[in-house]
Amino acid sequence: MKKRVVKVDSVEDRSKYWEGADILVFNTYVWWMSGLRMKALWGSFGNGESGAEALDTPVAYRLGLKTWANWVDSTVDSNKTKVFFTTMSPTHTRSADWGKPNGTKCFNETEPVKDKRFWGTGSNKQMMKVVSSVVKHMATHVTVINITQLSEYRIDAHTSVYTETGGKMLTAEQRADPMRNADCIHWCLPGLPDTWNRILLAHL
């Protein structure tokens, strides 16, 4: 398991920047997908990782979302602030998902998947259900914007080898090794995220 610890019982470090906003748009997913289990921490960081408990990722995700939901319900004035939650942004790191077992992740893909039923291994339906369950029980109205299915088709829309690492664009040598360096998580701009924004604007 990678050394990633999530503090699931507090949003204090970030929430001070959210207070009083007219529109709040939340999302969280990729950083949770480091494995089947994740270290979760309650209370102080004083004990470091020794105070963390390894939980199934969906369980830790639910705990974190419940903490967020409690903050929204106790702090946000729904007469002033509109709250949105966008669902997971898919990753496309396994070309066998779309019928190319000998492919190189999303590298050199130039067209979307045409199968309307397509759902790759880069999106976790169990995590989607966690979002729906938590939001359904909130006192504050939260509009869930489902970007996942429409984004699943766009294996062609990632930055691929035209990306950066450590703040620098990939070198020619790095671009020549797409199996190692192709970025099939982030998206090109202009591109698919503009569609997400159009959906958001339609709700405003």
What are these regions (language model features)?
Residues 1-204:
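Extracellular glycan-modifying ectodomains
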